[in-house]
Regions:
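Extreme N-terminal signal-anchor transmembrane helix of membrane signaling/transducer proteins, especially
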Residues: 1-7, 169-189, 201-228, 527-532
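Intrinsically disordered, low-complexity polar/acidic regions
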Residues: 26, 42-117, 122-145, 235-242, ...
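A short acidic/small-residue loop/turn micro-motif
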Residues: 154-156, 429-430
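Juxtamembrane extracytoplasmic/periplasmic/luminal helical "stalk" adjacent to the first N-terminal
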Residues: 1-46, 214-278, 283, 287-291, ...
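Juxtadomain coupling helices with adjacent low-complexity linkers
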Residues: 22, 148, 155-199, 449-463
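Membrane-interface helix-start motif
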Residues: 155-174, 197-201, 438, 511-532
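Juxtamembrane alpha-helical signal-transduction segment immediately C-terminal to a transmembrane helix
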Residues: 14-17, 187-195, 230, 533
Length: 533
């Protein structure tokens, strides 16, 4: 019976781990921008492409917090499966240059490309070792075409170690019960050998043995029922968390496709963009509440700075000048750089007084993001920054403008090449606001789920960015918990989802809020325990 229970628990645990690994592969495939994949050829030439480098960096950062061997991407080219972006560092034995042919794919690998359905594979052996893998397709959102597959590997040794722990738990329980039976039998046998006058102290040994066995079995049954109830509650919460994470991911896609890209399209399609047209655009567009400013900052070379300042003054802003903040926080004229990115258009102006003219690259964090956006020609997010004249941290999204009509206010741009970035368009937002907007609440505004957002980096621990909890009271420290990052228990349970956006790798930990815990109290295990006692 103990062996059968152990095999059953192993089967259950194996299914749980496979489902969790597959969920992670699906989540990664969903967060990847299909447009970035379309830019790849899955050949050696990809290694120089910003899209390839960005995907590798995001996979690498996210793979660091997963207890897996690696994250790959694969595509079919000329009848063979080839590798693309992956999480491995250069020099890793499993690292493959883009376009490397997968030498020993199994039939199950090909089946994913044939059907376009996610699947788990293994254990199997290939040229890299023995693994259990999860594969999920990355689909074109418009045509439904399968662009590539995401593959997550766990080494078979690591997998079997996780499974073996379940066997040891069952074995320990069976051993304790067996020792109690053997010990009780020895006591009874010893009692029967004693003279009648010495048996008084052990006269009721049968009752004691039955009570101990009953108590032990009660504990085992109560624990099993508690685990079953907890697993049921966790499944309910997983569905809720998936919906919640989907809303957050959709909010990020809206920021990318509608808010930031829409601003870029507006500039690219206009023959003349002046301050008033920018203001009309800002007022006409529906802004989500987390976006507190949109802006345009032209690229101004040092030789043209004085002429640029004068041209803006001639347009009606008589006190305009390009400035920065000194170490003491006091404004001072910007100087000493080859180029400047001063805020020229900023909306809503009345909510951001005194910011026009601020040189964005005077701040190291903003400068890093702006230069990366220009070099890659891809939209890029900053790390957390302090907003100009606003309390609390924020994140700024930058998109390089590669085509811009020459306006009267910007004569210094007339001689620039059409291939160069004319400047950057930006959206400033508060991440805690986007988390709270997408949060699900119950009665009395109690949170059913709490979302904690972290930024991931290969060289640093996860950095906390914000939480949907209004007072941060329910914010939990970041933790790892096996493949898929799903914690155990219920109060300590959380589900993690990746978000690859604006060149960053984020992870959102979704855990039960007070509303969910109140609606799903753990009762059945305690009830069984009390009845058993």
């Amino acid at each position: 019976a103990g062996w059968r229970v152990a095999q059953w628990r192993v089967s259950v645990r194996d299914g749980e781990l496979r489902a969790e690994l597959l969920r992670q592969a699906i989540d990664i495939s969903r967060t990847i921008n299909p447009q970035r994949v379309k830019a790849l050829s899955f050949s050696a030439s990809d290694i120089e492409k910003p899209e390839f480098q960005r995907l590798c960096g995001q996979m690498r950062a996210y793979g660091r917090i997963l207890e897996v061997r690696g994250i790959y991407s694969m595509a079919v080219r000329e009848g063979a499966i080839v590798f693309g972006p992956e999480s491995f560092e250069p020099g890793d034995p499993l690292a493959n240059p883009p376009g490397t042919v997968y030498g020993e794919p199994s039939a199950a690998h090909w089946e994913v490309f044939r059907t376009g359905r996610p699947s788990t594979v293994g254990p199997y052996r290939d040229e890299f070792g023995s693994f259990i893998s999860a594969l999920a397709p990355v689909l074109d959102s418009r045509s439904g075409e399968m662009l590539m597959a995401i593959r997550i590997d766990v080494e078979e040794v690591q997998w079997r170690a996780a499974i073996r722990r379940e066997q040891w738990v069952v074995a320990a329980v069976v051993l304790v019960l067996a020792l109690m039976l053997v010990g009780g039998g020895l006591v009874l046998r010893h009692r029967d050998r004693l003279p009648a006058e010495r048996q008084a102290r052990v006269r009721f040994s049968e009752y004691h043995l039955v009570a101990c066995l009953g108590l032990a079995l009660t504990v085992v049954v109560a624990k099993a029922l508690n685990d079953t109830e907890g697993q049921s509650d966790r499944e309910v919460f997983r569905h809720l968390a998936e919906s919640q994470a989907g809303r957050l991911a959709e909010a990020f896609r809206d920021l990318r496709d509608n808010q930031l890209d829409g601003l870029v399209r507006f500039f690219e399609s206009s023959e003349h963009v002046d301050r008033w047209e920018f203001r009309r655009y800002a007022k006409a567009e529906t802004r989500p509440p987390e976006v507190y400013a949109i802006a345009w900052a032209p690229r101004v070379c040092a030789q043209e700075k004085d002429a640029f300042e004068q041209s803006v003054r001639d347009q009606g802003i008589e006190t305009f000048h390009v400035f920065e903040q000194g170490p003491d926080g006091v404004d001072r004229p910007a100087f000493g750089r080859d180029e400047y990115f001063p805020l020229l258009y900023l909306e809503p102006t009345e909510e951001n007084p005194g910011a026009v003219g601020f040189d964005l690259v005077s701040d190291p964090t903003r400068k890093t993001a702006i230069h990366h956006a220009i070099q890659t020609k891809l939209s890029t997010a900053t790390d957390l920054v302090m907003p100009f004249l606003r309390p609390g941290p924020a994140v700024v999204l930058y998109a390089p403008l590669l085509t811009l009509p020459t306006s009267v206010a910007e004569p210094h741009l007339a001689r620039a090449s059409v291939q160069e970035a004319r400047g950057v368009l930006s959206i400033a937002l508060r991440l805690d606001a986007i988390l709270r907007r997408t949060a699900i609440t119950g009665e009395g505004s109690s949170l059913f789920v709490v979302m904690d957002l972290y930024q991931l980096d290969v060289s640093q621990p996860p950095r906390f960015l914000g939480t949907s909890s209004p007072d941060n009271a329910e914010h939990a420290d970041f933790a790892r918990s096996g493949p898929g990052l799903s914690g155990k228990g219920l109060a300590g349970f959380f589900v993690s989802y990746p978000i690859f956006a604006f060149g960053k790798s984020y992870v959102v930990n979704v855990h039960p809020g007070a509303g969910f815990l109140a609606a799903h109290p753990v009762r059945i295990g305690w009830t069984a325990g009390l009845v058993g006692v």
